[in-house]
Amino acid sequence: MAATGGRRCRRLEGETARAVLANVDTLLFDCDGVLWRGEAALSGAPAALGRLAAAGKRLCYVTNNSSRTRVAYTEKLRRLGFPPAEPRHVFGSAFCAARYLRQALPPGAAAYVLGGPALSAELEAAGIPHLGPGPAALPGPAPADWAQAPLEPAVRAVLVGFDEHFSYAKLCQALRYLLRGPDCLLVGTNRDNRLPLEGGSAIPGTGCLVKAVETAAEREALIVGKPSRYIFDCVASEFDIDPARTIMVGDRLDTDILMGNTCGLTTLLTLTGVSTLEEVRGHQESDCPARQGLVPDYYVDSIADLLPALED
């Protein structure tokens, strides 16, 4: 792949792959589109991670998905045949959001949550009082009624994650909490606009919900998920991480690769998910610094391509 003077992406194979992996202690993996699709592991992925673990590499899992807890991810990894993982090796946006609020909120403060059971579970584990998960109905037939619904005095943050019950009623309540003043934080798990499904279809992602709340509140949310470096800071707070000896492996340029590049990691794109080699070429040939930040150091067709470099 020819470059114009900026970042240059190369296929990771052969002796280059062996040399790169030999100089790495930690690999951070996105999950969906990298390790599995839905409930099926991608071919060769469990074997590749098994070889990496056997070689003494630290494996961590960094995902924007807020609909699973850390424990649920470890169970899925086990079920799909990946090396055993402890919850402390999983960094989902639900866990990272709870960690952020535990640091940012005063004792006893609560969060109003647009999200599901996993987000609620991580907040509970972090000791953060919260309300909001589940369906919500408007409190009356007229806008005047909607503006008079009871508010919980302890709420000092609005947290937006993936919420299948997102509604106008919830949007109204979120806005009313945020209008109480700038001391009420607005936090989002991620800005992913779409969640790709099998067969090329997609559903709206959490980013759509975050944008709705931002638009109503006329405020910008603090995002804890990729490409924010906060999620990497969560990893670095748990483990002694040397960025120069760490690889971020992902399938999305605008989240996985951008975060890795921002944090000074080696970045590896796998072509089993969202982003394509054509997109990489377009960014690589651009003189725009922002687009250059989306160019990975290396790419592979799939994680299974690492297997030859891991042979004894």
UniProtKB/Swiss-Prot annotation:
It comes from the Eukaryota. Mg(2+) binds at D30, D32, D251. The active site is at D30 (nucleophile), D32 (proton donor). Its cofactor is Mg(2+). GO terms for biological process: glycerol biosynthetic process; glycerophospholipid metabolic process; negative regulation of gluconeogenesis. Its EC number is 3.1.3.21, 3.1.3.48. It catalyses: O-phospho-L-tyrosyl-[protein] + H2O = L-tyrosyl-[protein] + phosphate; sn-glycerol 1-phosphate + H2O = glycerol + phosphate; sn-glycerol 3-phosphate + H2O = glycerol + phosphate. The record marks L195 as: Important for substrate specificity. Keywords: Carbohydrate metabolism, Hydrolase, Magnesium, Metal-binding. One of its GO terms (cellular component) is cytoplasm. PANTHER family: 4-NITROPHENYLPHOSPHATASE-RELATED, GLYCEROL-3-PHOSPHATE PHOSPHATASE. NCBIfam families: HAD-SF-IIA, PGP_euk. Belongs to the HAD-like hydrolase superfamily. CbbY/CbbZ/Gph/YieH family. Homodimer. This is Glycerol-3-phosphate phosphatase. The gene is PGP.
